[in-house]
């Protein structure tokens, strides 16, 4: 395998959503391949037809592409090693199964599900690890079943599976790129089913054959596949193939260090997409679930290009990685703070257009959807929002007149002297031809000073009148962005609508 071009793969089953653990596996395979100037491949493992979900394959690939993980070869992109869907490769698996049967490395098994369960329960009662009892192992392979009985069953068309014959008393060993040397005793290995009664291969059989035929050099996958390694290595040995290098990634854990599961929170990438997390933040976050740049590095925000240049399996740990959503949210904030304004503007326009289809704005649509106006909103709000969609939802007062006013703020700030003061100040603003933040601030201070009042007497009521809430960015800059016409209309409307709270 020395000198061979690096080839890695992500091989999901089309059974539904893309798990965040699956995204990490795909990402690490992608980063490793790209770092080594190799190829990253997507193969769909749909041998379990009972669990197959319609369109799951397309959704999986589109989610990966949204994350910036683009395959060099896949069912959608094609390639020289196809088909890339296992259900389209059945004749290949049957041919290799026949070869194993002929070489006495596999055998037919006609045991019924009831017999298998009975045997399993018996072994459990005896305190044994359940394994197939080799009832149908032929006499010429060390078993007790006459060849005539096997032939009779085949001639009758009885349903069967094909099992691998695990050698007795051998040690199966390999060097994991993350965990080091690992050894298995064949006495602990079951005679794995290779071909099911429906004519489809099991994951173990199809995966080994495809990994060899597609010439993958490195198999990077979750540690949950470690128990399957001896079966896979034996199959490589049966066929006389050199196995690829293997790396088994650490488990993903909840904050309480239990295994990450849907019972304790969202585990689908699509869940986080719907909440508004960006692909950059999710990829950055997932990359750090097991990998770190090394001692002395304090960098936590990485672009895809940086991840490719810095990623190595040597820096992937063995211990479980804690999935902390707070860290993901922190990363999202960092990206919003540094993302180019024009990119954010382009991203939030569809969100705003959807809102405009529901609600009518008081200002012209042309103005509030213009790049110039949206850029001002972004610059003013980017320190205050957690997700891009909040530039529209959390900051809706930049686009729509408030329909209500925060009750607690009104009770505290809307005193009896506020309406006449606001009316008087609004008249002054109307005559202001220089409607900038600096000018508005100077005008307000000059207005309240002779009255012996502090600016806060008007600052808070103006914010309530204009935005409907008691919090937000710099008031003066907010007024400048909204513009004189909208500000005056909202102040005067609030004077009419808000009742002075009873003393």
UniProtKB/Swiss-Prot annotation:
GO biological process, one term: glutamyl-tRNA aminoacylation
Keyword presence, Protein biosynthesis: yes
Matches recorded under SUPFAM superfamilies: An anticodon-binding domain of class I aminoacyl-tRNA synthetases, Nucleotidylyl transferase
Positions of short motif 'KMSKS' region: 259-263
Motif 'HIGH' region boundaries: 12-22
Catalyses which reaction(s): tRNA(Glu) + L-glutamate + ATP = L-glutamyl-tRNA(Glu) + AMP + diphosphate
GO molecular function, one term: glutamate-tRNA ligase activity
Location in the cell: Cytoplasm
Domain of life: Bacteria
Top-level enzyme category: ligase
Keywords for this protein: Aminoacyl-tRNA synthetase, ATP-binding, Cytoplasm, Ligase, Nucleotide-binding, Protein biosynthesis
Transmembrane segments: none
InterPro entries: aa-tRNA-synth_I_cd-bd, aa-tRNA-synth_I_codon-bd_sub2, aa-tRNA-synth_I_CS, aa_tRNA-synth_I_cd-bd_sf, Glu-tRNA-ligase_bac/mito, Glu/Gln-tRNA-synth, Glu/Gln-tRNA-synth_Ib_cat-dom, GluQ/Sye
Record EC number: 6.1.1.17
GO CC aspect terms: cytoplasm
Pfam family membership, one: tRNA-synt_1c
Gene3D superfamilies: 1.10.10.350, HUPs (3.40.50.620)
Subunit structure: Monomer.
Functional description taken from the UniProt entry: Catalyzes the attachment of glutamate to tRNA(Glu) in a two-step reaction: glutamate is first activated by ATP to form Glu-AMP and then transferred to the acceptor end of tRNA(Glu).
HAMAP family linked: Glu_tRNA_synth_type1
Family classification: Belongs to the class-I aminoacyl-tRNA synthetase family. Glutamate--tRNA ligase type 1 subfamily.
Name by which UniProt lists this protein: Glutamate--tRNA ligase
Lineage summary: Bacteria, Pseudomonadati, Chlorobiota, Chlorobiia, Chlorobiales
Gene: gltX
């Amino acid at each position: 395998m020395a000198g061979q071009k690096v080839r890695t793969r992500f091989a999901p089953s089309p059974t539904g959503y893309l798990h965040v653990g699956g995204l990490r596996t795909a990402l690490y395979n992608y980063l490793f391949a790209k770092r080594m100037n190799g190829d990253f491949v997507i193969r769909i493992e749909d041998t379990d037809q009972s669990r197959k979900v319609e369109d799951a394959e397309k959704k999986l690939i589109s989610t990966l592409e949204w994350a910036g993980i683009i395959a060099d070869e896949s069912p959608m992109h094609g390639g020289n090693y196809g088909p890339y869907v296992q259900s389209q490769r059945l004749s290949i698996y049957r041919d290799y199964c026949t070869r194993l049967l002929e070489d006495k490395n596999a055998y037919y098994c006609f045991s019924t599900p009831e017999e298998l369960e009975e045997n399993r329960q018996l072994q459990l009662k005896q305190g044994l690890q359940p394994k197939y009892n080799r009832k149908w192992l032929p006499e010429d392979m060390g078993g007790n079943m006459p060849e005539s009985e096997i032939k009779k069953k085949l001639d009758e068309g009885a349903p069967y599976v094909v099992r691998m014959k695990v050698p007795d008393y051998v040690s199966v060993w390999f060097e994991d790129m993350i965990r080091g040397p690992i050894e298995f005793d064949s006495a602990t290995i079951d005679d794995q089913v290779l071909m099911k009664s429906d004519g489809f291969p099991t994951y173990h059989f199809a995966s080994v054959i495809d990994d060899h035929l597609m010439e993958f050099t490195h198999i990077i996958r979750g540690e949950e596949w470690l128990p399957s390694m001896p079966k896979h290595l034996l199959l490589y040995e049966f066929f006389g193939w050199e196995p690829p290098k293997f790396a088994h990634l650490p488990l993903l854990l909840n904050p309480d260090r239990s295994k990450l599961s849907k019972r304790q929170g969202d585990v689908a990438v699509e869940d986080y997409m719907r909440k508004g997390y960006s692909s950059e933040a999710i990829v950055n976050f997932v990359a750090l679930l097991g990998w770190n740049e090394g001692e002395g590095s304090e960098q936590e925000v990485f672009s895809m290009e940086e991840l490719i240049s810095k990623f190595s399996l040597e820096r992937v740990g063995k211990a479980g990685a804690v999935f902390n959503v707070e860290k993901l949210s922190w990363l999202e904030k960092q990206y919003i703070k540094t993302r180019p304004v024009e990119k954010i503007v382009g991203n939030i326009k569809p969100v705003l257009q959807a809102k405009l289809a529901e609600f009518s704005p008081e200002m012209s649509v042309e103005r509030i959807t213009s790049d110039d106006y949206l850029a001002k909103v972004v610059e003013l709000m980017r320190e205050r929002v957690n997700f891009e969609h909040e530039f529209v939802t959390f900051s809706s007062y930049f686009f729509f007149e408030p329909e209500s006013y925060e009750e607690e703020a009104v009770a505290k700030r809307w005193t009896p002297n506020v309406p006449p003061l606001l009316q008087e100040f609004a008249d002054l603003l109307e005559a202001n031809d220089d409607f900038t933040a600096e000018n508005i601030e100077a005008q307000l201070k000059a207005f309240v000073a002779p009255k012996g009042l502090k600016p806060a007497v008007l600052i808070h009521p103006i914010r309530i009148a204009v935005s409907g809430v008691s919090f937000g960015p710099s008031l003066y800059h907010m007024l400048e962005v909204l513009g004189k016409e909208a500000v005056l209309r909202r102040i005067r409307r609030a004077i009419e609508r808000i009742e002075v709270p009873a003393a």
